[in-house]
Amino acid sequence: MTQEVLEAVKEAKEQSKPRNFTQSVDMIVNIRDLDVKKPENRFNEEVTLPNGRGKEVKIGVIADGELIVQAKDAGVALVINKADLEELGKDRKAAKKAANSVDFFIAQADMMPLVGRFLGPILGPRNKMPKPVPASIKLDPLLERLQSTVKVGIKQQPAIQIIVGSQDMSDEDLAENIETVLTVLDRHLDKGRNQIKSMFIKTTMGPIVRVI
């Protein structure tokens, strides 16, 4: 499928009007013959794109103690301590703003019960529940990996829409990222990519280009 993907990526970029920001490139895949009511047909997997996402990934860290220090030193987009967490639990508007301001959350493992209690109803529907990590972890390697990570999953609808890069990346790099996501679908779908009903590529504000 690589040639078809390459051609669709090129067309999507060419048809996208210039904007005053760097647009992301998305892939949209609709799956046939998949009953999402069955738990075995639902999945959510973190995937490392070989050529990165092309834009900075904003990360929030929920922690106390040494992890807070590491997070601040690393300059992450959002740092939430225990007191902040409790305050967000009282202010739904602020909690939504925090949830929408980052792409991924990391949380100190022993704080996950509090995260579930105070932020679960906000983060869950957004597919942003934190990745639990031990208090002793070195954050930098994880933060670096998350810069190239996307979540590929099927929950309520037999479809996925995810960022696979940015418009200033080469067509070849974007196509390789897309093929990486298709490999994930090969693993999770009974008939692999043969179960794909339709597939599209688009930039953030651009028209949809059909691949299959």
UniProtKB/Swiss-Prot annotation:
Top-level lineage group: Archaea
GO terms under cellular component: large ribosomal subunit
Signal sequence, start to end: none
KW tRNA-binding (keyword) present: yes
Biological process annotations from GO: regulation of translation; translation
Coiled-coil ranges per UniProt: none
GO molecular function, one term: structural constituent of ribosome
Keywords: Repressor, Ribonucleoprotein, Ribosomal protein, RNA-binding, rRNA-binding, Translation regulation, tRNA-binding
Main function: Binds directly to 23S rRNA. Probably involved in E site tRNA release. Protein L1 is also a translational repressor protein, it controls the translation of its operon by binding to its mRNA.
Description of how the protein assembles with itself and partners: Part of the 50S ribosomal subunit.
Family: Belongs to the universal ribosomal protein uL1 family.
Protein name: Large ribosomal subunit protein uL1
Lineage: Archaea, Methanobacteriati, Methanobacteriota, Methanomada group, Methanobacteria
